[in-house]
Each structure stands twice: as C-alpha cells, then as structure tokens.
C-alpha cells in the first residue's frame, strides 16, 4: 500500500472527527447581512486558531475591522515556503430568511439520514472543514511537503469580499500568490447513464447591482390625478425587464462538451434554446446552467418606495441583480439598459460593479491533479472534468486577478445528490459522504502538487 492510500485510509478512520468539526463550525452563526456591523467571522477564526494550536499548527488572523477576521494557515512541515497550492474558502454565511420553515435548527448542526443540516453547512463550512482536516491529518502523520501549502478562509464572501479576499489582495497580495488555488464553485457530479462527470469551475460570470430610481410627482392619495404615480411606471419597468431578450452567446468552453450530455448537434446561438428545452427533461441542472451561461440576466430583487399609505409615491427604487458574460463590460450593460428603458421618462440608474467576469485556462496541471486526486478519493479509475463557468461569483476572482490559476472544486461524492444541498435555502445541508470525499481530495491534491516525499 502506498503512502497516499494510507493517508486516505486515515481519513476514513477520522469520519467522526470530521463530522464534529463541521458541526462546531455550523453552530457559530457567522451571518453576513451586508450591513455593518455584521459577519462575526472572528468567532469562527478564533475557534479554528485554538484548535490548530493544539495540533502544533500556527495561524494568523488579519482584519480590516474588528470582528471580521481572515484566517491564514501555512502548513508547517515544508522544505520550501514558496506557496504551490492555496486552499480557499470563506467563513461568513447568508442570513436565514424564515426560520419557521426550517425542519432543523439553522445553527444546530443536526444530523439526519447521513446529512448535516444548518446554514453554511454546504456554503462554505464543508469545504473549510475538508481543507482543515486534510492539513491536520497530514501534519499528525509527519508528512513533509517539498513546496508550500496555504489555507485562507476569508470574511465577507457573501457580500463581495471587501472585508475578505478583496481587502487581502489590496493589502497583502503576497499571501494570495500561489501557482494554483482551489476554491468553492465546482466539483458537482453530473450523472449521465452509467457515467459520472464533474463540473470544474474555471470561471465566473460578472455581477453588477443596478439601483433604478423611478420618478413621479407626489400628491394626496385621495386626489391621485394631481400627481404622477411612480408605481405605474414601476410596472412598466418590470414588464420591460421581464420581456428583455438578451443577446445569446455560446462561446464559453462549457458548450464544447455538450456531446457528454448526449447532444449531437453543434451548439450555436440558433439552436441553444431548443437544446435547453430538450435537456430540461433529462438533465434539468445542465439545462439551467446552459441557459445561464448563454446570456446576460437582469433580475429585480428589491423594491423600495413610498413614505405614507395616503400619499402618491414620488419616487421608487428598484434594485436588480445583473450577471454578465466575459465580453460584457460595464459599458455594454449601460448600453443595454439605455435601449431597454429608452421610452420611460424620469428614470435614472446607478451601477455598482461587484465582480468582473473571470476565468482560468482549462488545460493545466491543476486540472490533471484534481482529476487524479478525486478519482483516488472516490475509488474509481478516472473521472471526466467539464469546464464550467459559474453563474454566481466567489473569491476566486481575486486570486485570478493576482495571477493564480484558480479552480472551483469541492470534491462532492457521486452518491450525494446536489439538489439536497439547498445552498442559501431552507434546510441547507451537506452529505457526510461528501465531507469525507472532499477531505480525501484536498489531501491527495496537496500530496500530489506539493511533491510530498
């Protein structure tokens, strides 16, 4: 039996410890509302730092503001401190919108039917657990690495990273410098017949928030004809957004692999919507992803307006989420909005560019190493990877900007149904099988890339 297999067997023997760590992390309510003071990431970081100290592993905490720490851990037993592999995650979680709808305590870390439930159990404390345990178990076994292995778990990922990886990039870019990095945003299995493929997160759509101000003229509600009700203009704006026909595009690498999903036709802008409809019946997740990756989306999310119930509203604000493809910059978005609303009078909008589109090349040593590591983790000869662009955004954009090849890959187990994860939703959860396979994958990846001897 080779050294790596012995280490993977130790992971199997450590399932109880892996599960307990995940539960402890979920029980810390590191909720990020996006409005300061918020986050509470420091409580998570302090817990982990104390745990690592007992293992003889030092950690560093850095923050822009108190309570919002970022965790930095360097694997201690290395020959060269030059960072080869960066393991990325985040400690903040989104709020629980309606706790009464939850079957399980959102911050209880309860176990049922082989799953751990709670806010952040999947996004992103499961990945953090797997990465931490891979480091801890290697260190206990005295594994020496030729090149550096670093873990960074950032604050504020759920609201743009301005207290997390974004702040670290501005102030400590050297910490984010590595040849390769692995983060959330991929590693989801897609079963097609008897074959299993995995989506590898090679890039991300851009994200903008647009605040649309719709202006009218106030009046008393008993004499509404004396005013101009901005609510009616809002209705027009919403109808325009609902019926918006974005430009179609099939140039992303993902569409070059559609034959894996049984699509025989060459994908083009002319047939993509027809193929999406066909895929919806047999592979709904692939269908949804194909739709997201072939167009820009504009989604109304927040409406604010009116000051009293007996007054005609003079002004209404509509906030929309916009997701863009790689070639669609801020100028493109403004041009699209101008065309969309050209017949609406008294309307203004401000754009906040949260994340630019970003990507890493698919053909790299990191891709090959992930494929090999995860195949070893789940006990198969090989796995097929498909390059995927995320319709969401993660902290990967900061490391890519810093010159690091970065992929999203969590190492989910093929038996763990991703639909049950319910990320950001009610009863969010992670399969214990994925916690274990993720830990094995992170360990095998570090062992391979950092040239363990």
Regions inferred by a protein language model and the residue ranges of each:
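A common structural junction motif
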Residues: 91-92, 241-245, 338-346
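Active-site metal-coordination/substrate-binding segment of hydrolases
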Residues: 81-150
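An extended, acidic, His-containing surface patch that forms the Zn2+-binding/catalytic region
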Residues: 48-52, 57, 74, 80-82, ...
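Histidine/acidic-residue-rich, glycine-tolerant segments that coordinate divalent metal ions
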Residues: 143-230
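N-terminal helical capping/dimerization or prosegment-like subdomains
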Residues: 2-99, 315-319, 332-334
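Short, solvent-exposed loop/turn segments at the edges of secondary structure
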Residues: 68, 104, 146, 176-177, ...
